[in-house]
Amino acid sequence: MSDHIWSATASLPNSRPPPLASSLVGIWSTVGVPKVAQFDNHANFRGGIQPVYQHFGPVVATCLDLGVTPRFIPVAEPWRNGVIEHFNDVWDKSFFRNETFTSLDHLRTENTAFIEFHNAYHRYSAHEGATPDQMWKYRLCKPLSAGYRPPTRLLTQTRIEVVRYIRSNRHIDLFGKGITVTEDQTHQYVTAIIKVRSKKVIVITLDGEIIHQGDFNLSPVLR
């Protein structure tokens, strides 16, 4: 993962999973396909409604189809996506609140102009004074084909990562599927790796210790 900022956005008629998946396709067609895509735990990204943990949605399916590992941050820890939150603040205060839009098409047009200006001229301390375009000039690679379309079913390949903090109740919640660990494994961050093809899940500590292995049923139907 990188803490460098290079912006590409999509203006959507709504934030439901299918439009979000399509927006990812549009963005990755511009900036290239990443190895990992990090999301919060909102159902629009994850798909499905708890406790039906077996179902993921179009965003996750698109990641798996392109060989991207979807990684979900710990619950109620938005700072894990701090770079995104920082850009959202810049976008909101420097653009969205300062303009009046007559339609969604108008917003899209003005948003495209803002993004081009932002990437060419906005400077962040994390870039040591460089602009996003300067930072990413030689980093953008593996562009997505313009003809790509998001899948309509969950593919059985790669994996899904879910980061969680184990509290004193010894409980790990994976979108409705509960896992209980021993008391000596509490008060630490772990990563649950859902192996899509084998429909298994393993839970690993930061030290690389496997503290749980079990089944994780998955449905090919997207929700």
Language model segments and positions:
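C-terminal, beta-rich DNA-binding module of retroviral/retroelements integrases
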Residues: 119-223
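RNase H-like DDE/DDD metal-dependent nuclease/strand-transfer catalytic core used by mobile genetic elements
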Residues: 2-106, 110-112, 117, 209, ...
